[in-house]
Amino acid sequence: DYTTICDAGLVRQALTNLLQNAKDSLQEHHVAAPAIRISMASEDDMIAITLADNGPGFPEMDLGKLLEPYVTTRQKGTGLGLAIVSKIMEDHGGNMQLGKADGGGALVCLKFPIHTTTRNGKII
């Protein structure tokens, strides 16, 4: 078991935002059998939560630009969603990575630092 310290409300906001983005993209592109996969794993000293869909994926561009405020590739997008998620991750000492899922969809990986517990139960 691994432990991380986080603000549950902010992490919920981040996950909700990412799931909504995936849902919107799958609907806008009329994906026949839409799917969003969520997985969790430990990687080195981080806990990784990965969301992957089977939509068209991110556009061919510098994906880091999508994390900047007001940058959007969608007609009705504000360009704030991914920037907010990125800031939430930064505030938690973690990070967010964008990429391509197997099969070409969008992949987002949220990484939180692992905190270890001492024998007396304190988190360090």
Language model: regions and residue ranges:
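Short alpha-helical Gxxx[C/S/T] motif in the catalytic ATP-binding
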Residues: G81, V85
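Conserved micro-motifs of the catalytic ATP-binding
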Residues: T3-C6, T73
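Acidic ATP/Mg2+-coordinating residue in the GHKL
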Residues: D53
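Short beta-strand-loop-beta element adjacent to the nucleotide/active-site pocket used for signaling
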Residues: P34-R37, A41-I49
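Detector for a conserved hydrophobic position within an alpha-helical segment of the HATPase_c
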Residues: M89-E90
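A residue-level detector for a conserved hydrophobic packing site
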Residues: V11-R12
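Short conserved segment of the HATPase_c
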Residues: F58-P69
